[in-house]
Amino acid sequence: MTPFMTEDFLLDTEFARRLYHDYAKDQPIFDYHCHLPPQQIAEDYRFKNLYDIWLKGDHYKWRAMRTNGVAERLCTGDASDREKFDAWAATVPHTIGNPLYHWTHLELRRPFGITGKLLSPSTADEIWNECNELLAQDNFSARGIMQQMNVKMVGTTDDPIDSLEHHAEIAKDGSFTIKVLPSWRPDKAFNIEQATFNDYMAKLGEVSDTDIRRFADLQTALTKRLDHFAAHGCKVSDHALDVVMFAEANEAELDRILARRLAGETLSEHEVAQFKTAVLVFLGAEYARRGWVQQYHIGALRNNNLRQFKLLGPDVGFDSINDRPMAEELSKLLSKQNEENLLPKTILYCLNPRDNEVLGTMIGNFQGEGMPGKMQFGSGWWFNDQKDGMERQMTQLAQLGLLSRFVGMLTDSRSFLSYTRHEYFRRILCQMIGRWVEAGEAPADINLLGEMVKNICFNNARDYFAIELN
């Protein structure tokens, strides 16, 4: 019987153990997509307690707690921090088989150093007190944890109207060497069908000093904000394409669509598709000219529980996987961006694992001459950010493309404790390659495969995003 979560956790062959301990383990972290609040990094935030750093805002944990019958007041409500932590501690033993069980104990181990102890009601007091004592120390501040975890770069997720003042503050601080750069997330300028669109256009017009009436005005406003983001070191965009649409339109049609929406009219699905296509093609060309990377996160079905959405708002654990087709529309969109050779470096993520092979083959259609891995099939995202999901994604990428050129893992997280997801990914990667070697499906060449592992863990992302590190 193998003990739970030793130093060789998941490393079930000798070759996997060599790959992980000698090549993967000590690689720095290049976290190119996350949802950390830049203000907390700028202020070097000190966490009040274990709830503050670990459960606050974590919809993964809230979903599990609700499934375990926990009352909403103990998830998102007015219960005390300790009551919420105790509710989580009571839920953890029921999460065996869920990635939360592994994540929880990896996060207790690093950075808190808690090993050989499982979170449950009987250990809750001890773990709460031990972690809170550590959180009072300087090296457990927001920046301290990032430094402990050997982070070199993080890309936050930022709206085009954001001032980026916190990024500027971080950049000016010569004592802090981790790159914290904004990522451009223009969903609110793109989702013309949303009730909030007109208010957002007013805000975008205000910050860009542009009166947005025609499509060209929107392009002008977005270009000004792209320049603002570029001045703060941005090299990455991110789009939530819950449904991939494609429909072409001329400028007069786009002007009419925008004018009708600004007048409060409801658009047809075809008109929405025309507008969204035009925005994505325009932005893709801007990214290509600037040398940016665009990310498309495809296939979320959001805010399913309308009653809870009205009470609690978005992003609190009521989203799931969509099953809308994507292949034809995505192909047309990428081909349109590529017509004038203005398809930027692109990472495609799917939420429905049914679409893994769709993306795995789609990227091969648009690879760039002289640019290894220009088009990327992104790491297992959200509901696929677990052992089976990561194995499936990497296996299919290897079979349909080049695993060796993969830019690897990202946390996509709101928590400063999520960096152990990189460790989890690295262990799974080494386990997978070790099994190939054990089965005689890959050569037992430690130099060849060790270098490949190092590249996937860090070097490929560093080179792909072309961000100069400190």
From Swiss-Prot:
Keywords: Isomerase. It is an enzyme of class 5 (isomerase). Its EC number is 5.3.1.12. PANTHER family: URONATE ISOMERASE (PTHR30068:SF4). HAMAP family: UxaC. Belongs to the metallo-dependent hydrolases superfamily. Uronate isomerase family. This is Uronate isomerase.
